[in-house]
Amino acid sequence: MSSLYTAHLGNNADLIRAVSDFYVASGQQVADVTYGKGAFWRKTDTTRFSLHVSDIVTCPDALHDFRDLPYKTGSIDHVIFDPPYMHNAGRPMVEERYGNATTKGMYHDDILVLYAQGMKEARRVLRRDGLLWVKCKDEIESSRQRMSVVEIHDIAVRILQMTVKDLFILVPSSIPPVQHKKQYHARKSHSYLWLFKK
């Protein structure tokens, strides 16, 4: 197995493959509670563990709200949590591209509430020492820096009493052009994947 580094160049599927190869043992129970179209798992061999998928919109056989999961308390080894954080109220193109049916018209603080609710429920279903994987991205909202990576850490550690297992920084191999020519802050092209231990 090659070394795993915190900084990763590529896409979500590349990162998830590397992290799951390192952290997910054969036969473990993995619940992706924001499955979407399954983009995370396209490059991962999921036959060596039990992958349970659900989504509030895209999984007809498993339409579950991540705030009210169907799993027993303490029954899952890994919960994968990637809620629609790419939002821009009033910009339908952004909301449609990122599947934001549940966050349409929401702002950063509203989405943080969803994170907190989903992470609390994920903690419930995790086994002792189970891992919660949380995807997030910093953003600028109304000309203010919103450091989601810090806010998500505080929810997990201060409120839910979890501990940090790892943090990955994903830098895409290609960056789409921006529409706005005038720049006030550095562009945020990277995202994060937190791993918190129950």
Task: Label each PLM-derived region with a short phrase.
Residues M1-K198:
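Class I S-adenosyl-L-methionine-dependent methyltransferase catalytic core
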